[in-house]
């Protein structure tokens, strides 16, 4: 009997379920989209039932597609949008409020007050994060303070908090399991990443009762079994990780110094720093990459707010292209003499600048600027921002050699050969595109398969990582330096200050 791994990839706009074979190839894939809700400016919410129904429906659809039953599934692995926050009734399972999504900015005022009171150094030292509405801690506090009766019920032990993984585990197990993994816990502002435990000082700071919190476990291990009524037989749940950490695992970035970058609407790059957390001096985040056998592996993380969204803007905002797939071909026809730069700060700039209030700009426009130059500027903006992240990572990590680290890439944008070649050119480093594009789901599947014995130890799994294509630098050094200097000049104009070379 074929043994399969069912990977649940719960994202911001859709949920996907994939069945992986023992050789890590995909046997089935199902996807269901669901709406986001925007009740006020800067607010983003999900209906918890949408998260649950889309998960259940896609899992069942993937099983039907593969002609497989629950007994052919060795284990389930879950990966999820991080930081999105839910609180529900322990007895009924009913959420007390819609899920507050990671993009939501409603707690900006609370974060600003806590910064003014001098609390950010404590938060950063314990958690590796910044005091920002992005993370779960202030979202929890908002729900407790704004939903009538929620704080009293939480103090009485009647409520449970979880990121999306915890909520799905609760629902899948029929309310028998209230747990999370270390990668998701590390995104809450409440978890000491050095001790691997919830932090009492931070709980007091945000006024959150410990009884609300899930138990924290390894990323690969026992997370309970599904209610037998859901799929016809119980299925063990054996792996959990936040989406960017799961992609790091799926890319087999197990050695210190290995870097992966995921390109979707935005971009997230993680550098494995091994068993020791590295405090950033360049506004990167320090986070847990994964936890296996009680041992934590850490990473430096940088986030770019706009990657694929720049191409969506070309298509939907300007009408420059009819489809995203056209952008690379159009960029290839751009005039090399036209040095046009797009700084895509549509919602501010992320790492390593963290300037939420600046807005985007185009530099270098002339009467000769055409759609081709705009397309090139949009795609190059992603490459320039990645170069900024990797420069910050090399500066932060003392064990890095500062030379051309290979970058492993995944996400929708990596299908563009032109963009990947330009990325390699501007990084002066090889860019590796894997054969298996669904690296986030593969990471969740691997963590589950490792726990149930279907997949080998990390070192052997890494040997089976399959390269589809390597892009190697082909741009002359002086050209690269001129283009990077032009980018930093454009960013400096936007910020109103010089941006130094790394």
Curated annotation (Swiss-Prot):
Q: Which reaction does it catalyse?
A: glycerol + ATP = sn-glycerol 3-phosphate + ADP + H(+)
Q: Which GO cellular component terms, listed alphabetically, does the Swiss-Prot or TrEMBL entry include?
A: cytosol
Keywords from the UniProt entry: ATP-binding, Glycerol metabolism, Kinase, Nucleotide-binding, Transferase
> Recorded E.C. number(s)?
2.7.1.30
Q: State one molecular function term (GO).
A: glycerol kinase activity
Please give the superkingdom of this protein's source: Bacteria
What is the top EC class of this enzyme, as a single word? transferase
Metal-binding as a keyword?
A: no
Residues binding glycerol: 82-83, 134, 243-244
Where along this sequence does the record place binding of ATP? 12-14, 265, 308, 312, 412
Q: Which residues bind sn-glycerol 3-phosphate?
A: 12, 82-83, 134, 243
The activity regulation comment is: Inhibited by fructose 1,6-bisphosphate (FBP).
Asked whether the keyword Kinase is assigned, the reply is: yes
Family under the similarity heading: Belongs to the FGGY kinase family.
> What function does the entry list?
Key enzyme in the regulation of glycerol uptake and metabolism. Catalyzes the phosphorylation of glycerol to yield sn-glycerol 3-phosphate.
Designated name of the protein:
Glycerol kinase
Can you name the source organism? Methylobacterium nodulans (strain LMG 21967 / CNCM I-2342 / ORS 2060)
Gene name for this UniProt entry: glpK
């Amino acid at each position: 009997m074929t043994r399969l791994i069912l990977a649940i990839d719960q994202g911001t706009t859709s949920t996907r379920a994939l069945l992986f074979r023992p050789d890590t190839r995909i046997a089935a894939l199902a996807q269901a989209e669901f709406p986001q809700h925007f009740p006020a400016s800067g607010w983003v919410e999900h209906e918890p039932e949408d998260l649950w129904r889309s998960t259940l429906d896609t899992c069942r659809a993937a099983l039907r597609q593969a002609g497989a039953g629950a007994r052919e599934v060795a284990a389930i692995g879950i990966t999820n949008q991080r930081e999105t926050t839910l609180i529900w009734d322990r007895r009924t399972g009913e959420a007390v409020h819609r899920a507050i999504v990671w993009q939501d900015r409603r707690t900006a005022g609370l974060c600003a007050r806590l910064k003014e009171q001098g609390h950010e150094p404590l938060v950063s030292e314990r958690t590796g994060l910044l005091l920002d509405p992005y993370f779960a801690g202030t979202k929890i506090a908002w729900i407790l303070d704004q939903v009538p009766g929620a704080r009293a019920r939480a103090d009485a032990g009647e409520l449970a908090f979880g990121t999306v993984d915890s909520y799905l585990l609760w629902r899948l197990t029929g309310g028998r399991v209230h747990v999370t993994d270390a990668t998701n816990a590390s995104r809450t502002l409440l978890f000491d990443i050095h001790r691997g435990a919830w932090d009492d000082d931070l709980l007091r700071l945000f006024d959150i009762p410990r009884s609300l919190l899930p138990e924290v476990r390894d990323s690969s291990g026992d997370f309970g079994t599904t209610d037998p009524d859901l799929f016809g037989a119980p299925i063990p749940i054996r792996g959990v990780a936040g989406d960017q950490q799961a992609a790091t695992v799926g890319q087999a970035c197990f050695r210190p110094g290995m870097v992966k970058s995921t390109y979707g609407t935005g971009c997230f790059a993680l550098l494995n720093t091994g068993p020791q957390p590295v405090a950033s001096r360049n506004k990167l985040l320090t986070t847990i990459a994964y936890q296996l056998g009680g041992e934590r592996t850490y990473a430096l993380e940088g986030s770019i707010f706009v990657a694929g969204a720049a191409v969506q803007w070309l298509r939907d905002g300007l009408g420059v292209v009819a489809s995203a797939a056209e952008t690379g071909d159009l960029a290839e026809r751009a005039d090399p003499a036209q040095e046009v730069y797009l700084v895509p700060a549509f919602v501010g700039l992320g790492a390593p600048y963290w300037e939420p209030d600046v807005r985007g700009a185009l530099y270098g426009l002339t009467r000769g600027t055409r759609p081709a130059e705009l397309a090139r500027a949009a795609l190059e903006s992603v490459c320039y921002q990645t170069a900024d992240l990797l420069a910050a990572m090399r500066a932060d990590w003392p064990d890095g050699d500062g030379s051309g680290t290979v970058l492993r890439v995944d996400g929708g944008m990596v299908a563009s050969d032109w963009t990947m070649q330009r990325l390699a050119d501007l990084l002066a480093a090889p860019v590796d595109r894997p054969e298996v594009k669904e690296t986030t789901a593969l990471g969740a599947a691997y963590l589950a398969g490792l726990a149930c014995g279907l997949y080998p130890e990390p070192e052997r799994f890494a040997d089976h990582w399959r390269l589809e294509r390597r892009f190697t630098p082909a741009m002359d050094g002086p050209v690269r330096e001129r283009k990077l200097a032009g980018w930093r000049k454009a960013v400096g104009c936007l910020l109103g200050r010089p941006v130094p070379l790394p």
